[in-house]
Amino acid sequence: MSISVTCCGTGTPIVVLHGWGMNSNIWQPVVPALSEHFQLYCVDLPGFGDSVWSSENDVSLESFIEQIMPALPPRFHLLGWSLGGLIATQIALTHSDRVMSLTTVASSPHFVESNDWAGIKPDILEQFQQQLDSNFKKTIERFLAIQAMGSEDAREQVKQVKQLIFTKPMPDQGVLKQSLTILQTADLRQQLPNIEVPFNRFYGRLDSLVPERAIDDISALAPESKAVVFTKSAHAPFISEPERFISELLKVVEN
C-alpha cells in the first residue's frame, strides 16, 4: 500500500486528514488524548509525508480520495483540517455510507476570496505557486507563518509545527503545486446542502486563511451543520487550544 496510515488507540474509528504542505505528524499534540477515546487513523495524504503519489491521474480531490479510501476502515468518523477538510467534505458527499460524521477544521468549501465571499486573497496563493519553483521548503515555512498569524503564541507555534512536520520526508513537489491549485479552484459551496451525515465545523477566530466572517456564509449553505469557534486560535485550533479541541470533538462523536 502506497498510503501511509498510522493507527493507534481503541474504540470508534476516526480518520484524520492534514492540510496543504503538511503530514500526519501535525496531529501529534492531540494524538495521545484522542487515542484514549478512539481508534485513530492518521493519514499521510498521497505525495505527503510517507505516502507516495501512485495515481496515473492528475492531482484532484477525486484522485486523492481514490487512493485514500482503500486504506481506511469500513466506517469511521472523519476529521479534516484545511485542505484535508475539503477532501473530507468530498468524501462525505461521495461515500456517505462509510462516513459516520464529518468535522472540518479551519476549512472552507471555497478558499479564495471574491466580491461576495471571504477567503484567502488570490494573489497570496499565486505568490506561493511562483515561490514553490525556487524554494519549496521556504514556501511551506512562510505558509506556516501565515497560518499562525494572530494567535498569541504565533512564533512558538511555527517552531513547534516545523519540528513536527519536518521529521517526515518533504512533499512531492508536483503534488504540492497541483494541490495548491485545488485550494485556488475547488468550489463545493453548492454541494454542501447534499451532505447527509452529521456535519460540524471548527474555526479559529483569528484565522486569516478562513476568516471569521466566512462562518455565517458557510452556515447559510449548510444550515443543518454546527459551527464551533475557538476564540484564541488562528488556523490550527488543535495546536492553540488542544484541550477544548478534544472536548468539542468528543461531543461530536458522542452525539
From Swiss-Prot:
<feature type="domain" description="AB hydrolase-1">
    <location>
        <begin position="13"/>
        <end position="242"/>
    </location>
</feature>
<comment type="function">
    <text>The physiological role of BioH is to remove the methyl group introduced by BioC when the pimeloyl moiety is complete. It allows to synthesize pimeloyl-ACP via the fatty acid synthetic pathway through the hydrolysis of the ester bonds of pimeloyl-ACP esters.</text>
</comment>
<comment type="pathway">
    <text>Cofactor biosynthesis; biotin biosynthesis.</text>
</comment>
<dbReference type="InterPro" id="IPR029058">
    <property type="entry name" value="AB_hydrolase_fold"/>
</dbReference>
<feature type="binding site">
    <location>
        <position position="20"/>
    </location>
    <ligand>
        <name>substrate</name>
    </ligand>
</feature>
<keyword id="KW-0963">Cytoplasm</keyword>
<dbReference type="InterPro" id="IPR010076">
    <property type="entry name" value="BioH"/>
</dbReference>
<keyword id="KW-0093">Biotin biosynthesis</keyword>
<dbReference type="GO" id="GO:0016020">
    <property type="term" value="C:membrane"/>
</dbReference>
<feature type="binding site">
    <location>
        <begin position="82"/>
        <end position="83"/>
    </location>
    <ligand>
        <name>substrate</name>
    </ligand>
</feature>
<protein>
    <recommendedName>
        <fullName>Pimeloyl-[acyl-carrier protein] methyl ester esterase</fullName>
        <ecNumber>3.1.1.85</ecNumber>
    </recommendedName>
</protein>
<dbReference type="GO" id="GO:0009102">
    <property type="term" value="P:biotin biosynthetic process"/>
</dbReference>
<dbReference type="Pfam" id="PF00561">
    <property type="entry name" value="Abhydrolase_1"/>
</dbReference>
<keyword id="KW-0378">Hydrolase</keyword>
<feature type="active site">
    <location>
        <position position="235"/>
    </location>
</feature>
<comment type="similarity">
    <text>Belongs to the AB hydrolase superfamily. Carboxylesterase BioH family.</text>
</comment>
<feature type="active site">
    <location>
        <position position="207"/>
    </location>
</feature>
<dbReference type="GO" id="GO:0090499">
    <property type="term" value="F:pimelyl-[acyl-carrier protein] methyl ester esterase activity"/>
</dbReference>
<feature type="binding site">
    <location>
        <position position="235"/>
    </location>
    <ligand>
        <name>substrate</name>
    </ligand>
</feature>
<dbReference type="GO" id="GO:0005737">
    <property type="term" value="C:cytoplasm"/>
</dbReference>
<keyword id="KW-0719">Serine esterase</keyword>
<comment type="subunit">
    <text>Monomer.</text>
</comment>
<dbReference type="InterPro" id="IPR000073">
    <property type="entry name" value="AB_hydrolase_1"/>
</dbReference>
<feature type="active site" description="Nucleophile">
    <location>
        <position position="82"/>
    </location>
</feature>
<dbReference type="InterPro" id="IPR050266">
    <property type="entry name" value="AB_hydrolase_sf"/>
</dbReference>
<feature type="binding site">
    <location>
        <begin position="143"/>
        <end position="147"/>
    </location>
    <ligand>
        <name>substrate</name>
    </ligand>
</feature>
